[in-house]
Design a protein with these regions (language model features):
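Subtilisin-like serine protease catalytic core
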Residues: 13, 24, 28-29, 160-201, ...
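Short acidic, glycine-rich surface-loop motifs adjacent to enzyme active sites
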Residues: 265-288, 310-311
């Protein structure tokens, strides 16, 4: 039996996020999915030092991943013991430890949550809530002549780079999204080879299967902007010879969990992706979601990976004003600080936040706007005052009226608009 003192319960309430406490009040004894974030995080300098003697980037990354896994396994040991003991009484299920951000995701009861909140290793416990993580970027049919390079490719001069011999060949880009129609002929011949374990060129995190097929269309459209090679007649990709890894973290309707973002990033990094593209994000994210995703983005950068991430299409939404208008993880810091940011510096992460422009270089009116702040989190940096905070976005790319791959037609195309469409443009340019 779990016994809580009144003193302990008071302490627990400081660790349990308000969103989770509200859910506990409503759900009573019902099991609930939570993220248990530990206080300890791997020191970045120590992480880099463990692999400083090797120059091979893959060997270096594998050494650092092993260190992160050892660190998290050790730090999570006591909490894991409690969880597995409670699982024998059916009070805990679906236990999963994460090494990228040192937290544990599980489904458990209110009493176990209160018990864990008193443990000295626990920083916070958050509600791992399913949320809609896309925007209403409607697909429109497109009829156009074949044997062309589309406008957004030429607008950023990607075709000029191809003429210099750079087409993305040898660069592995992971699309973390609704999955990808890997049968589309414009990407089918340059997909990641996952061997017999991952025969469909990636992973489906949301369903825990090895088939990341896209049934919604968002991820396929994004993938085409990265590396659609024009086999069916229209070159849509910035880097037409880049290799594509397909990671599905959203369900058939665009819903998902912050914990699955992290799992998708872990998969991409562990399987040697060079670049990540994420055209999704959490609106009004909780402190726990912001914390675990920023921790993941910090370590992703340490492991030598950068990510193009959409800022969102919430620029006209009064319910999420600046400095909370940019979605997470698009609000995470960049890999490099712009000189204009030096008046208000902070720590770095892997995120290159992407906004959208039209073909006349006008800002997309619905694009989310910065600056943002992290003073409401354990990071406590980038304090916000008007026109200060953390500058978001970092860069803008064509995102209005973008033609790319249709998930319902293996040789078809369609048109979409939004920062989701601008983000893979940046990821593709990174690959070049």
């Amino acid at each position: 039996m779990i016994v809580l003192s009144f003193c302990g319960l008071g302490f627990a309430q400081n660790v349990i996020e308000p969103e989770l406490q509200n859910a506990l009040n409503q759900k009573g004894d019902e099991m609930i999915s939570v993220n248990i974030i530990l206080k300890s995080q791997m020191d970045s300098e120590k992480l880099r030092a463990c692999a400083e003697k090797t120059t091979d980037k893959h060997v270096r990354r594998n050494i650092m991943i092993d260190e992160l896994k050892l660190f998290s396994e050790k730090e999570q040991q006591e909490i894991m013991s409690i969880l597995h003991a409670e699982a024998k009484s059916n009070r805990v299920a679906d236990i999963k430890g994460h090494w990228m951000a040192n937290y544990i995701n599980c489904t458990t009861t209110r009493d176990v949550i209160y018990l864990l909140a008193q443990h000295p290793d626990v920083m916070m416990i958050g509600y791992n809530q399913e949320k809609y993580l896309l925007w209403d970027e409607k697909a429109e049919p497109v009829e156009m002549s074949r044997d062309i390079v589309i406008e957004n490719v030429t607008m950023v001069n990607a075709d000029d780079v191809w003429a210099m011999g750079y087409t993305g060949d040898g660069v592995l880009v992971a699309v973390i999204d609704t999955g990808v129609n890997y049968n589309h002929v414009d990407v089918a011949d340059h997909l990641w080879d996952g061997g017999p374990q991952f025969p469909h060129h990636g992973y489906n995190i949301i369903d825990n299967t090895n088939d990341p097929m896209d049934v919604l269309g968002h991820g396929t459209h994004c993938a085409g902007t990265i590396c659609g090679d024009g086999t069916s007649g229209i070159i849509t990709g910035m880097a037409p010879d880049a290799t594509l890894m397909c990671i599905r973290v959203l369900d058939d309707y665009g819903y998902g969990y912050a914990s699955d973002f992290n799992t998708g990033m872990e998969f991409a990094v562990e399987h040697q992706a060079d670049i990540i593209s994420m055209s999704l994000g959490l609106m009004s994210a909780s402190v726990s979601d912001k914390t675990l995703l920023r921790n993941a983005c910090v370590n992703t950068l340490q492991l030598g990976v950068v990510a193009a991430v959409a800022v969102g299409n919430d620029g006209q939404m009064a319910m999420v004003p600046v400095p909370n208008n940019v979605r997470v993880p698009g609000s995470c810091p960049p890999p490099w600080l712009h000189p204009d940011q030096e008046v208000n510096p902070g720590a770095l992460s892997c995120v290159v936040a992407v906004g959208a422009i039209d073909y006349y270089e006008n800002m997309y009116e619905n694009g989310s706007k910065g600056p943002v702040t992290w003073t409401d989190t354990p990071f406590n940096d980038y304090p916000y005052n008007p026109n200060i905070g953390l500058i978001r976005p970092d860069i803008c790319a064509p995102g209005v009226g973008i033609k790319s791959l249709d998930h319902d037609n293996n040789d078809g195309y369609n048109l979409k608009t939004g920062t989701s469409m601008a983000t893979p443009c940046v990821a593709g340019v990174m690959a070049l």
